Structure formats: C-alpha cells, structure tokens
Regions:
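N-terminal low-complexity, intrinsically disordered segments
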Residues: 3-44
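A general marker of short, structured functional hotspots
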Residues: 14, 29, 36, 46, ...
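Acidic, low-complexity, intrinsically disordered interaction modules
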Residues: 48-94
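Intrinsic-disorder/low-complexity peptide segments enriched for small residues
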Residues: 5-11, 35, 66, 80, ...
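Initiator methionine at the very start of the polypeptide chain
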Residues: 1-2, 120
Length: 120
C-alpha cells in the first residue's frame, strides 16, 4: 500500500510525536516539486492538504491536476508521511493582506524528512 503525501504551509513542531527528532529540509524547484508529486500520484499515494490558504490550494490543484480541500485541521506526523511544505515567498507576504492571485513562482517548495532520535 502506498503512503501519503502531506502538504503543509509550515511545520508545527507540536505535530512531531517524538521527544527527540532530526529534521532535514530541502528546498525544491517548482519543476522538481511537480515531478515528485506527480510521480507519487501515479504510484497511488494519497495526498492530504493541511493548507487553509485558498489561493495556495487553488494553485496546487492547477499545478498537479488534482482536487484538494482547504483545511484548518491540525496535522500530526505519522512515520510513513512524505511531508512537503508550500509557503509564500517572503517578498510576497504583505502583513494584514490576503493574497488571492498566485503564480507558481510566488511560492517556495520544501521536502521535509523527519526521523525519530538525534542524528547530529
């Protein structure tokens, strides 16, 4: 059985159920992000979004040709999760303003690996 892809706009440390964990974060290009997710989709991975920003969810739906839900649920890490963070580029953030029109280049894409224990 395939695992699940988790899409977040940030990684809350309270979502990690370990006393000690090692976290590796790798920034991805737009192309690499699309390619990785499309490959996982083809392999039958479930994609779960914990992103509540509608414009980001709408853009991801277009980029990946899938249906996602806007979600305000709390994420809890599971060992088989493949975690991706999709967040607004700092230069696009305007305090107190809702961004409604996004292009793929307005976002930054990360792949996150979370491992129980200290590996540093």
């Amino acid at each position: 059985m395939a695992g699940r892809i988790v899409l977040l706009n940030a990684l809350p440390l309270t979502a990690i159920p370990y006393d000690t964990a090692t976290i590796l974060v790798k920034q991805l290009s737009i192309e690499r992000f699309r390619e990785e997710l499309r490959n996982f989709i083809e392999k039958g991975y479930e994609i779960v979004s914990y992103i509540r920003h509608k414009a980001t969810v709408d853009l991801l739906e277009k980029m990946l040709n899938i249906k996602l839900n806007v979600s305000s649920e709390l994420y809890k890490f599971s060992e088989n999760d493949l975690v991706y963070i999709v967040t607004l580029a700092p230069e696009k953030v305007v305090r107190g303003q809702e961004i409604t029109d996004l292009k793929p280049g307005d976002l930054i894409y990360y792949y996150v690996v979370i491992v129980k224990g200290a590996w540093i």
